[in-house]
Amino acid sequence: MRQIVIDELSPMERDNIDSYLKRNCNAGPMIGLYWVLLPDNILSEIQKEHGDCGPFYCGIEVEQDSVRFELLVRSSSNLHCKCISYATTEQRLFLLNFIDNILEEEKIKA
């Protein structure tokens, strides 16, 4: 799995990130899992064509001392479709900016 990992988090930093994600993302099916929705204007052509598969999101997993941001763009309604793929350059930039905002707003030093 391609992902971006922020590790060596203190318990307080992890809790602050978890709180940020609760306020700004959709909760996943298990504790510590979140979905960051991708804006329509950065979807790939095939994702735009597959409107019924949307909305599209990337997963985030909060662990004991780290947070993992998946670079796989998933469908909300379909597990197996050609519109599910790794993030494009523009989508990766969106995720990096999202991560930078978390680190800045929550004053994460890790």
List PLM regions with ranges.
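Long, compositionally biased, intrinsically disordered segments
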Residues: 2-5, 29-33, 101
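Hydrophobic transmembrane signal anchors and adjacent membrane-proximal interface regions, especially
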Residues: 3-7, 48, 96
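Short, intrinsically disordered, mixed-charge
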Residues: 19-27, 101-108
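C-terminal basic regulatory modules in eukaryotic proteins
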Residues: 54-110
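Short, surface-exposed beta-strand/loop "edge" segments at domain boundaries and coil↔beta transitions
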Residues: 12-15, 43-45, 76-80
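Ser/Thr-rich, low-complexity intrinsically disordered terminal regions
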Residues: 16, 22-55
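Residues in well-ordered beta-strands of folded domains
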Residues: 7, 35-37, 61, 70
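Terminal, regulation- and interaction-focused segments at domain boundaries
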Residues: 1-19
